[in-house]
């Protein structure tokens, strides 16, 4: 219910129809006009592209070197076997990848129930057919690599990345990680009191059984909400640039006059005038220094030459001298 004309209607879940264990229809209303397509399309795209899942990515079949081979005693060719494995619905708990094995001989069909796995793996449809053996002496042995991921990654995009480390006979499979087999949405008319221009969103979805349809919709809505959080509070989130602070005084000015290695006579004259740092010295003029007892023109020339060798001179003006670091001492 709206409190004012400026408020937006808040939708609510009206109905969740469980058609089967993997097929669900969800109805959401009322939505403001146009919001049905806005939300429906966004959720549909996220459900198709961003739901995590598990998929077969690599297969090794004894006696098979490439996907265009055939195996004696097996009804299907290798390409068809790979397509059947691509459609395998499997869940892996606690790790990102695992290796399954399959070894069967004798006439009969080979299904997902024949796959050997540990307790961290769950085969959703054990009746899923992988291939058929047509000869009593026929046998097939394979190793199946299953990985966790998101979206769809074709085998062609991984060929160059894994070419050096991939052993001969290791067949790459297009990885379809998405647990969503089919999803569609429909926008119908809805009504609230006198308003008849509202939307009703109906989402119909089928999964491969590795995820509950309701959980998939909740997860997609969470992803959408998290991606939109940045727009709720728009601000500059760039890292602040830290500029290196330039020291208030050149380091040489903070050094004691003893570092100038003056003669003993000149050094003693400066200390008698309480000139302890080079910064104290450069602020004095020639006239001021000549008034210092026992400091003559020879000592003055020595001081000027030593300062000049360090790109300094007498009569310099230093604002805010002395610095607090010297005062604290």
UniProtKB/Swiss-Prot annotation:
Residues 249-329 are annotated as: Alpha C-terminal domain (alpha-CTD). The keyword Lyase does not apply. The keyword Transferase applies. SMART domains: RPOLD. GO terms for cellular component: cytoplasm; DNA-directed RNA polymerase complex. Its EC number is 2.7.7.6. Keywords: DNA-directed RNA polymerase, Nucleotidyltransferase, Transcription, Transferase. One of its GO terms (molecular function) is DNA binding. GO terms for biological process: DNA-templated transcription. Transmembrane segments: none annotated. InterPro entries: DNA-dir_RNA_pol_insert (IPR011262), DNA-dir_RNA_pol_RpoA/D/Rpb3 (IPR011263), DNA-dir_RpoA (IPR011773), RBP11-like (IPR036603), RNAP_asu_C (IPR011260), RNApol_insert_sf (IPR036643). Residues 1-235 are annotated as: Alpha N-terminal domain (alpha-NTD). It catalyses: RNA(n) + a ribonucleoside 5'-triphosphate = RNA(n+1) + diphosphate. It is an enzyme of class 2 (transferase). Homodimer. The RNAP catalytic core consists of 2 alpha, 1 beta, 1 beta' and 1 omega subunit. When a sigma factor is associated with the core the holoenzyme is formed, which can initiate transcription. The N-terminal domain is essential for RNAP assembly and basal transcription, whereas the C-terminal domain is involved in interaction with transcriptional regulators and with upstream promoter elements. DNA-dependent RNA polymerase catalyzes the transcription of DNA into RNA using the four ribonucleoside triphosphates as substrates. HAMAP family: RNApol_bact_RpoA. NCBIfam families: PRK05182.1-2 (NF003513), PRK05182.2-5 (NF003519), rpoA (TIGR02027). Belongs to the RNA polymerase alpha chain family. This is DNA-directed RNA polymerase subunit alpha.
């Amino acid at each position: 219910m709206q409190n004012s004309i400026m408020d937006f209607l808040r939708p609510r879940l009206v109905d969740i129809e469980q058609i089967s264990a993997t097929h669900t229809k969800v109805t959401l209303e009322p939505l403001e006009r146009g919001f049905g397509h806005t939300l429906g399309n966004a959720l549909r795209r996220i459900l198709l592209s961003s739901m995590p899942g598990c998929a077969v990515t690599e297969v090794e079949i004894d006696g098979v070197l490439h996907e265009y081979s055939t195996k004696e005693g097996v009804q299907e060719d290798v390409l068809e076997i790979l397509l059947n494995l691509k459609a395998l619905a499997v869940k892996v708990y606690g790790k990102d990848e695992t290796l399954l094995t399959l070894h069967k001989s004798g006439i009969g069909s080979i299904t997902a129930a024949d796959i050997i796995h540990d307790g961290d793996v769950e085969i959703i449809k054990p009746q899923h057919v992988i291939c058929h053996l047509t000869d009593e002496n026929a046998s097939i042995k394979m190793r199946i690599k299953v990985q966790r991921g998101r979206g769809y990654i074709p085998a062609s995009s991984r060929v160059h990345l894994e070419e050096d480390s991939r052993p001969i006979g290791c067949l790459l499979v297009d990885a379809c990680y998405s647990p969503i087999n089919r999803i569609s949405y429909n926008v119908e008319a809805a009504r609230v009191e006198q308003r008849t221009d509202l939307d009703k969103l109906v989402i119909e979805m089928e999964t491969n059984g590795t995820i509950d349809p309701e959980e998939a919709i909740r997860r997609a809505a969470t992803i959408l909400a998290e991606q939109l959080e940045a727009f709720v509070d728009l601000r500059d989130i760039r890292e602040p640039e830290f500029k290196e602070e330039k020291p208030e005084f050149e380091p040489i000015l903070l050094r004691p006059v003893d570092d100038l290695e003056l003669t003993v006579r000149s050094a003693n004259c400066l200390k008698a005038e309480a000139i302890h740092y080079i910064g104290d010295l450069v602020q004095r003029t020639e006239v001021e220094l000549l008034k210092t007892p026992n400091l003559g023109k020879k000592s003055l020339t020595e001081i000027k030459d030593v300062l000049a060798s360090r790109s300094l001179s007498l009569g310099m003006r230093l604002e805010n001298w002395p610095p607090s670091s010297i005062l604290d001492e």
